[in-house]
Amino acid sequence: PIAGSMVLAAILLKLGGYGIIRMMQILPATKTDMFLPFIVLALWGAILANLTCLQQTDLKSLIAYSSISHMGLVVAAIIIQTPWGLSGAMALMIAHGFTSSALFCLANTTYERTHTRILILTRGFHNILPMTTTWWLFVNLMNIAIPPTMNFTSELLIMSTLFNWCPTTIIMLGLSMLITASYSLHMFLSTQMGPTPLNNQTEPTHSREHLLMALHVIPLMMISMKPELIT
């Protein structure tokens, strides 16, 4: 069910990050070296999840693995226990909560019209549903973390935190972000561009679907422009 996927990606997945934040408060803040294996594991897990996204043919699985890769960055930032790291981790959890939920919503919009989640069978929607293609572009750009979105701010804080802690981590972070951009663009091009393989008539989009997307994108942009709204 699409509602379950949206709640799982937007809220339940972030509860683990919140639990780690609460647990780290009772641990000594100066002993980050003892957590080195966990930080490396989190970053390596993010890269592996990103690589898994690149080879996915199922649209819903691709979005699910995307959420896992972003949580790897969140865990690494939390474990370092710096103010910038915690701020970046919380901001990324909020930003990616909106983004992943919107992606699942768009995937369901496509599925209701094609009755398949295979990427190659869902292409060609830019001619049939241009407004939906616009939403796909907006949300994928947020997933890539372009400025001035909250995703960009949070990833910049996490990158600064990890680089100050150990400059070598910039290699893993850079690789992770490069692959994130690759699969996000691949997802957009695969689902929207090219000739449509369907010969049957496609149902137009409904106002409720555009309203649902607006309720994801507009709050995220408002928080990006004015973070004081949630502080």
From Swiss-Prot:
It is an enzyme of class 7 (translocase). The chain crosses the membrane at residues 1-21, 34-54, 63-85, 89-111, 128-148, 169-189. Its EC number is 7.1.1.2. The keyword Cell cycle does not apply. GO terms for cellular component: mitochondrial membrane. Core subunit of the mitochondrial membrane respiratory chain NADH dehydrogenase (Complex I) that is believed to belong to the minimal assembly required for catalysis. Complex I functions in the transfer of electrons from NADH to the respiratory chain. The immediate electron acceptor for the enzyme is believed to be ubiquinone. This is NADH-ubiquinone oxidoreductase chain 4. It comes from Deinagkistrodon acutus (Hundred-pace snake).
